[in-house]
Amino acid sequence: MTGIRSALPNPASLVESSTHRFLIFDAPNDDNLPLYINELKKYNVSHLVRACDPTYSTEPLQAIGIQVHDMPFADGGSPPDAVVNNWIKILGESYKKDSKETIGIHCVAGLGRAPVLVAIALIEGGMNPLQAVEYIRERRRGSINIKQIQYLKNYKSKKKSSCRIM
């Protein structure tokens, strides 16, 4: 967690790497979306990834310049290749050296699908899979189940080069 005070019922978790900032949270709905928008603004979110079925309109987010990407996959499961490839594309598009822009990402509870995608980003950045899980869990307790850990342990980076610097 960070020093920024949250108005959300379940506080968001900031995960930072050498190349990206991620804000993991649970799914908003149309009624509480304004609270989430305030939080997204605090963290300078430019891209928002929904890893679950939609529960709110994207229009208010798009109106303030946040690009919304739908990448749903099964609860408790691992992302299919198409989701991983889209996720990596977003990581590439959003990378800016020394940027304080953040990628917001959520699933229903913010404990499974969203943290798995963030772990993939950390692995793509050169982090060991189990270190990535531990790093995320330090910031978002209870995240990533055993099945997802197994997937991450076996995950192979999509980068062309095997030489990586964290």
UniProtKB/Swiss-Prot annotation:
Positions annotated to bind phosphate:
108-113
> InterPro entries this protein is in?
CDKN3, Prot-tyrosine_phosphatase-like, PTP, Tyr_Pase_cat, Tyr_Pase_dom, TYR_PHOSPHATASE_DUAL_dom
Where is this chain lipid-modified, annotation S-farnesyl cysteine? 163
> Which positions in this protein are listed as binding substrate?
113
Q: Which residues does the UniProt record annotate as the domain Tyrosine-protein phosphatase?
A: 10-164
| S-S bonds | 52-107
Propeptide positions: 164-166
Top EC class of this enzyme: hydrolase
- Where does the record say this protein resides? Membrane
Instruction: State any single GO MF term.
Output: protein tyrosine phosphatase activity
EC numbers on record: 3.1.3.48
**What family classification does the UniProt entry report for this protein?**
Belongs to the protein-tyrosine phosphatase family.
Q: What name does this protein carry?
A: Probable protein tyrosine phosphatase type IVA A
Q: Which organism is it from?
A: Dictyostelium discoideum (Social amoeba)
Upper classification of the organism: Eukaryota, Amoebozoa, Evosea, Eumycetozoa, Dictyostelia
